């Protein structure tokens, strides 16, 4: 509530608040991807499975991973549980998460990636072009502005098999850079 304390001065209330966070460094990046264990975190959003399985297959054609482990969280509008994140960090060296193509799922996908980075696992978070600004705001607010997302064309939920394949190409091209750069 805004109260007038002094009749000679006017005060303005700024409802935006202030975001203060401590910047967290990214997880150490590997020099090469061959021989690493790839983790796939599917947030169960429409077409996330198709995108992630397609990306895993395409990436495995380019990189000799030691293993590819697939995990599903059953709510795209909630963060992954600490137990699931700990399991992924224990069983994988790098992680691919998807999909951020709406407000809540994008926020949670980004938050999952940040949590994995804090557990020491480079994470490539797939978002769509419509949510780049929101992703950057989330990364800054949570103290990891240096985490680069994998950005694919929007939309995702209502696309054809051919469009899925095009987006898989975008993922493959960017994810390797996110993990190693």
Q: Which ranges hold each PLM region?
A:
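Active-site-proximal loop->helix
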Residues: 110, 118, 132-145
């Amino acid at each position: 509530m805004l109260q007038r304390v002094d009749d000679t001065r006017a005060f303005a209330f700024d409802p935006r608040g202030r975001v203060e966070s401590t910047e967290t460094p990214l997880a150490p990046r590997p020099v090469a991807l061959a021989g690493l264990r790839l983790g796939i975190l599917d947030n169960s959003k429409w077409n996330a499975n198709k995108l992630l399985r397609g990306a895993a297959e395409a990436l495995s054609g380019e990189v000799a991973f030691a293993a590819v482990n697939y995990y599903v969280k059953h709510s795209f509008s909630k963060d992954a549980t600490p137990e699931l994140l700990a399991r992924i960090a224990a069983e994988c060296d790098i992680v691919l998460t998807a999909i951020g193509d709406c407000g809540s799922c994008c926020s949670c996908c980004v938050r999952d990636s940040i949590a994995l980075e804090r557990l020491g696992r480079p994470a490539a978070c797939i978002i769509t072009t419509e949510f780049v600004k929101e992703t950057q705001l989330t990364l800054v607010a949570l103290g990891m502005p240096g985490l680069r997302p994998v950005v694919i064309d929007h939309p995702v939920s209502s696309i054809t098999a051919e469009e899925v394949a095009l987006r898989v190409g975008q993922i493959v091209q960017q994810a390797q850079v996110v993990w190693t750069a």
